Amino acid sequence: MAAPLDQAIGLLVATFHKYSGKEGDKNSLSKGELKELIQKELTIGPKLKDAEIAGLMEDLDRNKDQEVNFQEYVTFLGALAMIYNEALLQYK
């Protein structure tokens, strides 16, 4: 049986691949795929406006190829983890 952290990492990877490749490159997320992932997988997702998601896409797309590759996705997850950690510290 996999350890909890192994399971969590596996879920993060599987979530990327669940949404990537529907509109093109199977190893990256288009703007539409990123939007769908955010809206379906994050609690805050449905509350975000299209302009906010577009801004997030622009921030994440470091190589400016109009897609979010796995490395850019992991950067996004790291930023989210930092936000979640700050929220947790406030409630301790």
Swiss-Prot record:
- One biological-process term from Gene Ontology? positive regulation of cell division
Name this protein carries in UniProt: Protein S100-A6
**Keyword NAD attached:** no
Q: Note the PANTHER family from the entry.
A: PROTEIN S100-A6, S100 CALCIUM-BINDING PROTEIN
Would the keyword Calcium turn up in this protein's UniProt record? yes
Tell me the InterPro entries matching this sequence.
EF-hand-dom_pair, EF_Hand_1_Ca_BS, EF_hand_dom, S-100A6, S100/CaBP7/8-like_CS, S100_Ca-bd_sub
Sites where the protein binds Ca(2+) 2: D61, N63, D65, E67, E72
One of the record's GO cellular component terms: nuclear envelope
GO: which molecular function terms? Answer: calcium ion binding; calcium-dependent protein binding; enzyme binding; protein homodimerization activity; S100 protein binding; tropomyosin binding; zinc ion binding
Organism's domain of life?
A: Eukaryota
The record's listing under Pfam families reads: S_100 (PF01023)
Sequence ranges assigned to domain EF-hand in this UniProt record: 12-47, 48-83
What is this protein's function? May function as calcium sensor and modulator, contributing to cellular calcium signaling. May function by interacting with other proteins, such as TPR-containing proteins, and indirectly play a role in many physiological processes such as the reorganization of the actin cytoskeleton and in cell motility. Binds 2 calcium ions. Calcium binding is cooperative.
Recite the UniProt keywords alphabetically.
Calcium, Cell cycle, Metal-binding, Mitogen, Repeat
Q: Give me the residues that bind Ca(2+) 1, please.
A: S28, E33
